[in-house]
């Protein structure tokens, strides 16, 4: 019996591997069928995540409208997509200059976006501006700039494109948000405020447009890290709070987030929290045991401030 079990084990592993491969292939083909011929707008397409979303949706056969505030980088992304694409299975992306922090021009850009294909099926609100520092040292002008880029800009664009979705009774709006839309992390007051505001808006919008068959989705990773950068080491890393804060701030790779955005579109998920167990636990602790959460965070800040910076 033992010999039989040993002989069966490789076959079992092979069978499981085969099933996983089939599942992945079916999921990949399903993803393509879901977005094929769909008009997909991606804001801040020149960011790390924006590029990966562009790659995933372009490969899936979507009609892309790529938005960004730097024309040269948009053109570079365009060239990269075209160079590896099968022209018989993909569409040539449209490029649109858009700086969401300049809210005075968003309405006009929304019209330009609609003019590309006449409609929008999927809007991926990806643009984001970050700032870090003590609250009393961040100017009101910078606070406003962060709110314009992370809140007012995306909602102006969404409101401009939404009537078309409602009239056609179809569409999906995806907000790429952040864990800081659910809890605040010290020294990121302006950023956290903008992310809380954005999440609140799209949570409300979800209920409002459900009757029109318009789906509103939010994808909230911890942080979206750059391709080759790992969390930095410093003196503070030796403190007893390093585990909590490093796990809370250690980001997700852009490729992983882009694939999750595609799954969110494919499955029409309403909310996705893309994080390892430590940040997830922090959100639950913040909700169920707020005083404990505040105490831990405050102690961590005191510990950080008591350790001199390197260099």
Curated annotation (Swiss-Prot):
Residues 1-18 form the signal peptide. GO terms for cellular component: longitudinal sarcoplasmic reticulum; sarcoplasmic reticulum membrane. The keyword Ribosomal protein does not apply. InterPro entries: NAD(P)-bd_dom_sf, Sc_DH/Rdtase_CS, SDR_fam, SDR_family_member_7C. SUPFAM superfamilies: NAD(P)-binding Rossmann-fold domains. The keyword Manganese does not apply. It catalyses: all-trans-retinol + NAD(+) = all-trans-retinal + NADH + H(+). One of its GO terms (biological process) is intracellular calcium ion homeostasis. It is an enzyme of class 1 (oxidoreductase). CDD domains: 11beta-HSD1_like_SDR_c. Its EC number is 1.1.1.105. It comes from the Eukaryota. Keywords: Membrane, NAD, NADP, Oxidoreductase, Sarcoplasmic reticulum, Signal. It is found in: Sarcoplasmic reticulum membrane. One of its GO terms (molecular function) is all-trans-retinol dehydrogenase (NAD+) activity. NAD(+) binds at residues 47, 49, 191, 195, 226. The active site is at 191 (proton acceptor). NADH-dependent oxidoreductase which catalyzes the oxidation of all-trans-retinol to all-trans-retinal. Plays a role in the regulation of cardiac and skeletal muscle metabolic functions. Maintains Ca(2+) intracellular homeostasis by repressing Ca(2+) release from the sarcoplasmic reticulum (SR) in myotubes, possibly through local alternations in NAD/NADH or retinol/retinal. Also plays a role in Ca(2+) homeostasis by controlling Ca(2+) overload in the cytosol and the SR in myotubes. Belongs to the short-chain dehydrogenases/reductases (SDR) family. The N-terminus region encompasses a short hydrophobic sequence bound to the sarcoplasmic reticulum membrane, whereas the C-terminus catalytic domain faces the myoplasm. This is Dehydrogenase/reductase SDR family member 7C. It comes from Bos taurus. The gene is DHRS7C.
């Amino acid at each position: 019996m033992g010999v039989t079990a040993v002989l069966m084990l490789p076959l079992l592993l092979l069978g499981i591997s085969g099933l996983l491969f089939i599942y992945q292939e079916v999921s990949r083909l399903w993803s393509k069928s879901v977005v094929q011929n769909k008009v997909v707008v991606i804001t801040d397409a020149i960011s790390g995540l924006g590029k990966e979303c562009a790659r995933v949706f372009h490969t899936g056969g979507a009609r892309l409208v790529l938005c960004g505030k730097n024309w040269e980088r948009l053109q570079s992304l365009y060239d990269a997509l075209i160079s590896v694409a099968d022209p018989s299975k993909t569409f040539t992306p449209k490029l649109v200059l858009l700086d969401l922090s300049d809210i005075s021009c968003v309405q006009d850009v929304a019209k330009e976006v609609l003019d590309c294909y006449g409609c929008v099926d999927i809007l991926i609100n990806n643009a984001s501006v970050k700032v870090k520092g003590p609250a009393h040292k961040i100017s009101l002008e910078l606070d406003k700039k962060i709110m314009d880029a992370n809140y007012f800009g995306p909602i102006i664009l969404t409101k401009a494109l939404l009537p078309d979705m409602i009239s056609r009774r179809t569409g999906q709006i995806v907000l790429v948000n952040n864990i800081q839309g659910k809890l605040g992390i010290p020294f990121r007051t302006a950023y956290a405020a903008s992310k809380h505001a954005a999440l609140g808006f799209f949570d409300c919008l979800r209920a409002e447009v459900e009757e029109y068959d318009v789906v509103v989705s939010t994808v909230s990773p911890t942080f979206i890290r750059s391709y080759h950068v790992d969390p930095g080491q410093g003196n503070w890393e030796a403190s007893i709070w390093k585990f909590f804060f490093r796990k809370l701030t250690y980001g997700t790779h852009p490729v992983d987030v882009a694939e999750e955005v595609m799954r969110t579109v494919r499955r029409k998920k309403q909310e996705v929290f893309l994080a390892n167990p430590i940040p997830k636990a922090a959100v639950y602790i913040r909700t169920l045991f707020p005083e404990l959460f505040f105490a831990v965070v405050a102690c961590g800040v005191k510990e950080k401030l008591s350790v001199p910076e390197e260099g």
